[in-house]
Amino acid sequence: MTENSDKVPIALVGPDDVEFCGPPAYATVTVKPSGPARLLKVGAVVLISGAVLLLFGAIGAFYLWKGSDNHIYNVHYTMSINGKLQDGSMEIDARNNLETFKMGSGAEEAIEVNDFQNGITGIRFAGGEKCYIKAQVKARVPEVGTVTQQSISSELEGKIMPVKHEEEALVWVAVGQPVQDNSFLSARVLELCGDLPIFWLKPTYPKEIQRERREVVRKTVPTTTKRPHSGPRGNPGPARMRNDSRPSVQEDSEPFNPDNPYHQEGESMTFDPRLDHEGICCIECRRSYTHCQKICEPLGGYNPWPYNYQGCRSACRVVMPCSWWVARILGMV
């Protein structure tokens, strides 16, 4: 054998020589993707598709609700107060039994919320330091359908509303102390007042009118007490019949029912006089008008007649004919 031939035993092969014994690089085996990775991809696709469907469903439901909801309606109008044109708006919320009136803008804005469910009216003036409430009759605001919306628009929009301001009659004056417990107020009235102190309003008449009202009461009481004894004496005549049918006598003899302000008598409809007195609607009117009321602060200290209040501001609202309201409440129109 040749001396130069080197034979190395396999047992003597070092670790550096093992790489020569391995398979070539192109002979590596391909590994298949694992199952959890595939499931993650499928889950992500399903999740994104579901989110997109929910988004489109929410958008469709919102537009469907917005188009079919007829419980809230807004109308804007123009009124003339002391020769100055001012914009106003009325919002009817039949679902919550509320009416909201806004008059003026900026520092002259006045907001009135009528809560017919609880029989409370809330009034707030821009820049004021107080919020006012007063009691009112309870009623039910009709739902505002398409026909009613057209009727309100034709009645109010595009016209200058006449103003009825009782300068020498009724004045609302705030009491001296604020309300301590406001739990009886609705959420809408509390939202209107915010953090301002809330004061009750009490009706106040000038001294001359108070004396006239007392004189009328003195003259009316003897007449009503002697009426049962005057029947057999004969026919009282047309003049006596007219006096007996005056609304003032009906107000004294019939209690006011806030749950049924409309009474059916035969084929005609009669209205409770307090609906007109409280400014809910107008019994004798054939068209709507703007009713303004004076909200004043009490004059502290010595109160010389007739200056027992100060700092008066006006809050105005639209008053519709009672026949217009009852037609919609009873579903006649």
Swiss-Prot record:
Signal peptide as annotated in the record: none
Protein keywords: Chondrogenesis, Cleavage on pair of basic residues, Developmental protein, Differentiation, Disulfide bond, Extracellular matrix, Glycoprotein, Membrane, Secreted, Transmembrane, Transmembrane helix
Gene Ontology biological-process annotations: cartilage development; cell differentiation; negative regulation of angiogenesis; negative regulation of endothelial cell proliferation
Glycosylation sites (chain numbering): 243
GO cellular component entries: endomembrane system; extracellular region; membrane
The UniProt record lists the keyword Transport: no
Post-translational modification as stated in the protein's UniProt record: After cleavage, the post-translationally modified ChM-I is secreted as a glycoprotein.
Disulfide bonds, paired cysteine numbers: 131-193, 281-285, 282-322, 292-316, 296-312
Residues making up the propeptide: 211-214
Region of interest (Disordered), residue spans: 212-269
Pfam families with a match to the protein in the record: BRICHOS (PF04089)
Transmembrane regions listed in the UniProt entry: 42-62
Function of the molecule: Bifunctional growth regulator that stimulates the growth of cultured chondrocytes in the presence of basic fibroblast growth factor (FGF) but inhibits the growth of cultured vascular endothelial cells. May contribute to the rapid growth of cartilage and vascular invasion prior to the replacement of cartilage by bone during endochondral bone development. Inhibits in vitro tube formation and mobilization of endothelial cells. Plays a role as antiangiogenic factor in cardiac valves to suppress neovascularization.
Family the UniProt entry places it in: Belongs to the chondromodulin-1 family.
Alphabetized PANTHER family for the sequence: CHONDROMODULIN-RELATED, LEUKOCYTE CELL-DERIVED CHEMOTAXIN 1
UniProt name for this protein: Leukocyte cell-derived chemotaxin 1
Species name: Oryctolagus cuniculus (Rabbit)
